[in-house]
């Protein structure tokens, strides 16, 4: 069964999870990094066509394969489109051996208590059923922590874990992402509160439920080791969070057992103006460097 094979791969294989799920407000930034400015599109439909073309170019590049990449996180619109004549998630798994995940959140609430909670996810069960029918293995939801607020961080973690129970019921594996903003002055304190809150929620989880944790690279190396040892945690992955690729890799190398799930740091240096040879050379180098750092 594909699910059992994917589960084994997520737990045991070397490599990283590519984050290709830019959406909404983050799409223009991602396109600008790729040298696609507003002159390339007149409306949202054309903007999403441009981001899909970029993602397709990445996924179809020769180095985007299961040698270094365990999984890929997709935006819903990408999941609903095709690559090489197949729905994207099926193409990733059946042709490349890469596990597909789906970003399911609907964005963030306004900041309160130093954090951004998730907006209500409308028709979540329908969304999860659709994910399963498209061959998706797991989901991802991103919250943001801007302050070492005990109340705020507990709210973020509690909300994420509550949703994770619902996701597990659909036989999907949730990636829980409570991102700590890298520029805040009390980041280390926020991480202390965060790990305590996550451990409390893990202890309350049914033993059959499993999660993946996607966390900002910590101030103290190997700080998240206790989470990696928990029986309910399949993997702890790192977001790049605004660090450039060089710094993200350096920080990742200091955290044994943590693997990358980079977005901006993965696509760094890519441009619509590059020919295929130039493009493939850069993405190949990035994939190899990120995969190497994920093996420490």
Enumerate the predicted regions with their spans.
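Alpha/beta catalytic barrel-like cores
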Residues: 1-137, 145-148, 190, 197-215, ...
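Eukaryote-skewed repeat-based solenoidal scaffolds used as protein-protein interaction platforms
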Residues: 139-174, 179-214
């Amino acid at each position: 069964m594909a699910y059992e094979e994917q589960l084994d791969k997520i737990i045991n294989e070397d490599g990283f999870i590519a984050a290709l799920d830019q959406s909404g407000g983050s799409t223009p930034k991602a396109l600008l990094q790729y040298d696609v400015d507003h002159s390339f599109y007149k409306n949202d439909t054309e903007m999403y066509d441009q981001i899909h073309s970029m993602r397709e170019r990445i996924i179809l590049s020769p180095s985007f394969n299961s040698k270094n990449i365990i999984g890929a996180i997709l935006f819903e619109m990408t999941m609903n489109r095709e690559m090489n004549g197949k729905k994207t998630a099926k193409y990733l798994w059946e042709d490349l051996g890469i596990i597909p995940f789906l970003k399911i959140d609907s964005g963030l609430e306004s900041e309160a208590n130093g954090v951004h909670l998730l907006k209500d996810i409308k028709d979540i069960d329908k969304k999860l059923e659709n994910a399963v029918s498209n061959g998706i293995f797991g989901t991802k939801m991103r919250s943001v922590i801007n302050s070492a607020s005990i109340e705020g961080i507990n709210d973020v973690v509690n909300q994420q874990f509550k949703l994770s129970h619902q996701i597990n019921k659909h036989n999907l594996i949730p990636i829980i992402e409570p991102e700590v903003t890298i520029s805040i002055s009390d980041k280390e304190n926020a991480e202390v509160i965060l790990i305590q809150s996550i451990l409390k929620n893990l202890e309350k989880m049914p033993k059959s439920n499993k999660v993946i944790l996607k966390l900002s690279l910590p101030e103290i190396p190997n700080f998240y080791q206790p989470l990696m040892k928990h029986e309910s945690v399949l993997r702890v992955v790192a977001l790049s969070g605004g660090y450039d690729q060089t710094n993200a890799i350096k920080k990742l190398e200091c955290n044994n057992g943590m693997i990358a799930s980079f977005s901006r740091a993965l696509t760094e240096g890519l441009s619509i103006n590059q020919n295929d040879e130039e493009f493939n050379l850069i993405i190949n180098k990035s994939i190899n460097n990120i995969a190497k750092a994920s093996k420490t």
